[in-house]
Amino acid sequence: MRVQGGLQPEDWRHWGQFTTFKSNAADLLRRELRGDQRIYCSPLVDPYQPAEERERMMPRILEALIASPPHVFALQTRGPLILRDLGPLRALTQLTRLRVSFSITTNRDEVRRMYEPHCAPIAERLEVVRTLRNAGIETYATLAPLLPCDPEELVRLAIEASGRDLIGDPLHVRGVKPRGATTRGAAFQVSAARGHDEWLDPVFQEHVIRRVEGQAKTLGRSFAAGPSGFARLSV
């Protein structure tokens, strides 16, 4: 049926075209929280997407987590709106192992405008990572999905902002990855139109990963891609 988490067929058939909110998410969370849990929020849907500014779901969710903290809470986003909740996040980091994974996809803002036209500029995202870090929040600059970039410069910027090891993943589209998390098919069209097809090729992606790993090592850090990398968020 492919109907997951209370969603209806139209919700996933038109993925990315609108937002469906679970308005009672914080209430449901309060019922299910336990001290031994590792919670990842959220590998598929950004909790700080633009509509969150109006809906204000995350302050209620963070309030529930502060009242009954899990063992680990990992928060995945690319939205500068996270800074709105800096106070609750700082409180939560005193109670649990809070990790923020903040997506930095390229060092080239013209590429960001091609693939992520509605997302914040790269410079602003790097500044968010610095702000979270300076607030004492364990923050990873996550190179995912890896868009066309200068790998060495991207690694330098990410490590400079976060002061931590890096995690990430190549750009996957359903045409070359039959299972698991992928970027919308529009990315395939953008890549073809802009001459970036090689960035979808697994062999070329492996070459880029090696360059990222090498630069991270040169700067005294490490890089891990895919499940082994994201597993760092739950340790």
Where are these regions (language model features)?
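Conserved Radical SAM active-site core
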Residues: 1-99, 107-110, 122
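Auxiliary Fe-S-binding modules of radical SAM enzymes
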Residues: 147, 151-235
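Conserved strand-turn element in the central/C-terminal portion of the radical SAM core barrel
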Residues: 118, 128-151
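Aromatic/hydrophobic pocket-lining residues that form the small-molecule binding cavity
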Residues: 58, 82, 125, 151, ...
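Hydrophobic faces of well-ordered beta-strands that scaffold small-molecule active sites
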Residues: 39, 73-75, 100-102, 139-143, ...
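Glycine-enriched alpha-helix->loop->beta-strand junction motifs that scaffold or abut catalytic
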Residues: 94-98, 138, 160-165
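Active-site beta-loop-alpha junctions enriched in small/polar residues
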Residues: 44-46, 78-80, 103-107, 144-146, ...
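A structural motif corresponding to the C-terminal end of an alpha-helix
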Residues: 64-71, 127-139, 206-226
